[in-house]
UniProtKB/Swiss-Prot annotation:
GO terms for cellular component: cytosol. This is Isoleucine--tRNA ligase. Catalyzes the attachment of isoleucine to tRNA(Ile). As IleRS can inadvertently accommodate and process structurally similar amino acids such as valine, to avoid such errors it has two additional distinct tRNA(Ile)-dependent editing activities. One activity is designated as 'pretransfer' editing and involves the hydrolysis of activated Val-AMP. The other activity is designated 'posttransfer' editing and involves deacylation of mischarged Val-tRNA(Ile). Zn(2+) binds at C886, C889, C906, C909. It catalyses: tRNA(Ile) + L-isoleucine + ATP = L-isoleucyl-tRNA(Ile) + AMP + diphosphate. It comes from Thermotoga neapolitana (strain ATCC 49049 / DSM 4359 / NBRC 107923 / NS-E). Its cofactor is Zn(2+). Monomer. Signal peptide: none annotated. It is found in: Cytoplasm. A motif ('HIGH' region) lies at residues 57-67. The lineage of its organism: Bacteria, Thermotogati, Thermotogota, Thermotogae, Thermotogales.
Length: 918
């Protein structure tokens, strides 16, 4: 007789195949139609707020794997916080001013850009930026990221630009903004100043030369310097020695050379010069103020100064000083000693007339010529090349220079700003903790902030220059007047209107009282734009200052986190964030940086269209994102196998709960079967640990916990064990409903735990739940599963640790018999257990009723003899079970039914078939 139709086999419309790409698009459409973002916020009306403030990505191209990682991480945090009961708004933003966009636009326009006005160029830049805002917006939405996509913040919009100017005005009012001729990072290709945050370090080949400067007092005495920038020698005005270092005066032929004693050996090895004859030893301070012949110009001299930054790591301990081309040179040479600032280089990196014979040469090209000239003069000691880490422009990727120009700066020490920022850093929670020291050291060491850019695409600095006396003025009254114009017309007005319209009617030159001005055309560093976002976003509903969290890559310790805290402390008196969470960078599977030249770039949208966004989200959750993360298409594909295991777990749960009404069929805790009580207790432990991991943002631990739970504890243990009860017992029996009650709890809890990560699949699971389990239109509005300690029976949990250890021994014994062809399925077996001691014997006696189910065998008996497999708690012997195989449940029994109505079944199945087993 075929008993298949008498079994309670799983039934579900939840498909085995995910078809993620199409299914995800359907959910995106559904979410759009239901206005998901506002719907979820409405469900948390009146709840406490959690605000993750979005650091704006740059709108100059499609999203890359790094921006995808960042947005998905934020989405996981926001969705988790929502489920924990917070009202968690998320307003995405875009950074839309600045050099990278202007650079791209200038490439597209070519020579035409030379004939265009600043206003026309700005219009093209705006169109370009807004085009990519829309492109990126759709790409982020495709990743399943929930946000206020209809109302993002965009830094080029007038309502945002006004806030940038408002923050800037405060700094001007407080006296933190000044104009000065100082050496700053300068990109000769982009023809603009750069800030620290716009600098990247890459390997670069440079000349490495040793040059001797002749004393004006003693024609045989020389100081030897070392430099990797020969092109800066025309700007030389001094030589720096450390006041306390010992310097040796070495006899070389008829000459005496001054070199730091500790560097003599290295110098001699690198140059081949014999330095063995030391005629005198002196301190650096002994030479202070001495004049030496300029290496390039016969009519100039170079004065010795003292500087404690001089080190003994490389070179000679004698440093050539050019205040026009170096930060320390400026501080020690110009500020401390009053040496002149010489900077004979124009905005394109070519020498000016001041450089004499080198005029018109590009600085890089001049190195070779200058080295030849030094050689001809007989003062070149040695020349070679080195590869070293060197600053490069973030946009064009070319090497930058230090160049002295008139620029606007923010003083980081005026009004004790730096110290106040450091105090605020200590009040913020940094995740990981090392972030605190990283940003602290950057703030402690940073120079004043160069904030002016010689580009048109940015927020203009509303400074004016008096036509009568040449005084350049940056006045809060002018800024405020301009802000009123910006509110209506945007910052383009600065480039479109006459200067008379841009200043108050009663404004006069503070120096000479004249009323005739011209506009200055510098724009603000884009880090001021994005760093002012706290001022704009806190005007939005549900965005109180300070904001709860900033979450970006670890490079933002010197970028957005850095600019934001300086500006917020200046404007509001405190940090703009309570917590800062950082992630690492994405590398290929060999740990290399991604680059087009290596061909190892992974396009997130390619992954999404091939595998689905869910797989990308799962990959991210599997990664320890606090450190650098590896990705390749092979690594992504591995996640598809994990995804299938998780999906199959949910399919099994849904299939076996198809007839379960959570209100009518739920079994109270005290009536649950022992194994089910254990499984429910384990679920509480899973909920507790998952919550702890989410709270500490350790999503990879959530991933590992859930994957192990699904594969090891559910599929291979609990769900395997209860199959017999689910399929074989009477549909409404306590045996079956007890298992279903716990499986229902597992289904709901597991779905909620995974919802922030697997946002699409858990929405699909939610749509297949019993209608009584669906309180909302979306799983994203559900509340987090409650951890209930009262559902953990400590005795059962402790006892099951031992029982599961015994189960491992039983499985080994069964596998041996399977290999010997004694049994096929485990139900073919009988297991004889020999307890190792009385406490184990008592344990097995107590749980005798659950052992057959737990081991999935036909019979378990206890014995005092010895067993074939020696375990820690028991000895195990497995053999083929006696009797005949029940044709319904496949267990062996010696009491097989001979009934004509229900032949060849065991007593349990016979009772079920007759309706006698409840």
């Amino acid at each position: 007789m075929d008993y298949k139709n008498t079994l309670n086999l799983p039934k579900t419309s939840f498909p085995m195949r995910a078809n993620l790409v199409n299914k995800e698009k359907a959910f995106l459409k559904e979410w759009e139609e239901m206005d998901l973002y506002n719907y979820v916020l409405e469900q948390r009306k009146g709840k406490p707020l959690f605000v993750l403030h979005d650091g704006p990505p740059y709108a100059n191209g499609h999203i890359h794997i790094g921006t995808a990682l960042n947005k998905i991480l934020k989405d996981i945090v926001v969705k988790y916080k929502t489920m924990r009961g917070y009202r968690a708004p998320y307003v995405p933003g875009w950074d839309t001013h600045g050099l990278p966009i202007e650079h791209r636009v200038s490439q597209e326009l070519g020579d035409r850009i030379k004939e265009m006005s600043p206003a026309e160029i700005r219009k093209k830049c705006e169109e370009f930026a807004l085009k990519f805002v829309e492109i990126q917006k759709e790409e982020f939405k495709r990743l399943g990221v929930r946000g206020d996509w209809n109302n993002p913040y965009i830094t080029l919009k007038p309502d945002y630009e006004v806030k940038i100017l408002d923050v800037f005005k405060t700094l001007v009012e407080q006296g933190n903004v000044y104009r000065s001729l100082k050496p700053i990072y300068w990109c000769p290709r982009c023809r603009t100043a750069l800030a620290e945050a716009e600098i990247e370090y890459h390997d670069h080949r440079s000349p490495s030369i040793y040059v001797k400067f002749r004393s004006k007092d003693d024609p045989n005495l020389y100081i030897v310097i070392w430099t990797t920038t020969p092109w800066t020698l025309p700007a030389n005005v001094g030589i720096a020695l450390h006041p306390d270092f010992e310097y040796s005066v070495v006899k070389v032929g008829d000459e005496r050379w001054v070199i730091a004693t500790d560097l003599l050996e290295t110098f001699s090895r690198e140059t081949g010069v014999d330095c063995s004859e030391v005629v005198e030893k002196i301190r650096g301070k002994d030479l202070e103020g001495k004049e030496f012949q300029h290496p390039i110009f016969e009519d100039k001299t170079s004065r010795v100064i003292l500087a404690d930054y001089v080190s003994l790591e490389t070179g000679t301990g004698c440093v050539h000083i050019a205040p026009g081309h170096g930060e320390e040179d400026y501080v020690y040479g110009h500020v401390k000693y009053g040496l002149p600032i010489v900077s004979p280089v124009d905005e394109e990196g070519r020498f000016t007339d001041e450089a004499g014979k080198y005029r018109g040469m590009f600085i890089e090209d001049s190195n070779r010529v200058i080295i030849e000239d030094l050689k001809e003069k007989g003062i070149l000691v040695h020349a070679s090349t080195i590869t070293h880490s060197y600053p490069h422009c973030w946009r064009c990727k070319g090497p930058v220079i230090f160049r002295a120009t008139e620029q606007w700066f923010i003083s980081v020490d005026h009004n004790n700003l730096r110290q106040r920022v450091l105090e605020e850093i200590d009040r913020v929670k940094w995740i990981p903790e090392w972030g605190r020291n990283r940003i602290r050291s950057m703030v402690e060491e940073r120079p004043d902030w160069c904030i002016s850019r010689q580009r048109v695409w940015g927020t203009p600095i509303p400074a004016v220059k008096c036509k009568e006396c040449g005084e350049v003025t940056l006045d809060p009254k002018v800024i405020e007047h301009f802000m009123k114009i910006v509110e209506k017309e945007g910052t383009n007005a600065w480039f479109e209107k006459d200067v008379e319209e841009l200043i108050p009617d009663d404004f006069r030159c503070p120096k000479c009282g004249a009323r005739s001005f011209e506009k200055m055309l510098d724009t603000l560093d884009v880090w001021i734009d994005s760093g002012s976002s706290f001022e704009y976003i806190t005007t939005r509903e549900d965005h109180p200052f300070p904001l709860d969290m900033y979450l970006e890559g670890s490079d933002q310790h010197r970028g957005w986190f850095h600019s934001s805290i300086f500006l917020a402390v200046a404007k509001r008196g405190s940090a703009p964030y309570k917590e800062v969470l950082t992630h690492g960078f994405i590398k290929d599977e060999l740990g290399r940086k991604m680059s087009k030249s290596l061909g190892n770039v992974v396009d997130p949208m390619e992954v999404v269209e091939k595998y689905g966004a869910e797989i990308l989200r799962l990959w991210l959750a599997s990664s320890d994102y606090f450190n650098d993360i590896k990705i390749s298409m092979r690594i992504v594909e591995q996640q598809t196998e994990v995804y299938k295991k998780i999906r199959n777990t949910f399919r099994f749960l849904l299939g076996n709960l198809e007839d379960f009404d959570p209100e009518l069929d739920r079994v109270p805790y005290e009536k649950l079967l022992t194994i089910d009580k254990w499984a429910l207790g384990r679920l509480q432990e899973i909920i507790k640990r998952a919550t702890e991991y989410y709270d500490s943002y350790e999503f990879s631990k959530v991933y590992n916990l859930v994957v192990k739970y699904c594969t090891t504890e559910l599929s291979s243990l609990y769900l395997d064990v209860v199959k017999d009860r689910l399929y074989v017992e009477a549909k409404d029996s306590l045996y079956r409903r007890s298992a279903q009650t716990v499986m229902h709890e597992i289904l709901i809890a597991l779905m909620k735990i995974l919802a922030p990560i697997m946002t699409f699949t858990m929405e699909e699971v939610y749509s297949h739940l019993h209608e009584k389990d669906r309180k909302y239109k979306t799983v994203q509005a559900e509340y987090w599963p409650e951890y209930r300690e009262d559902l953990i029976d400590k005795k059962i949990m402790e006892d099951f640790e031992k029982l599961l250890s015994i189960r491992e021994d039983v499985l080994k014994a069964l596998e041996e018999k399977r290999q010997q062809d004694v049994i096929g399925h485990s139900l073919d077996a009988e297991v004889i257990l020999v307890p190792r001691n009385d406490s184990v014997k008592a344990l097995l006696e107590e749980y005798r009723d659950v052992l057959e189910e737990l081991f999935i065998v036909s019979k378990v008996s206890l014995s005092d003899g010895s067993g074939e497999l020696k375990g820690e708690l028991v000895e195990v012997t497995a053999k083929h079970a006696e009797g005949e195989k029940c044709q319904r449940c496949w267990k062996y029994t010696t009491e097989i039914s001979r009934s004509e109505e229900f032949p060849a079944v065991c007593p349990r199945c016979l009772a079920v078939l007759k309706g006698e087993r409840k």
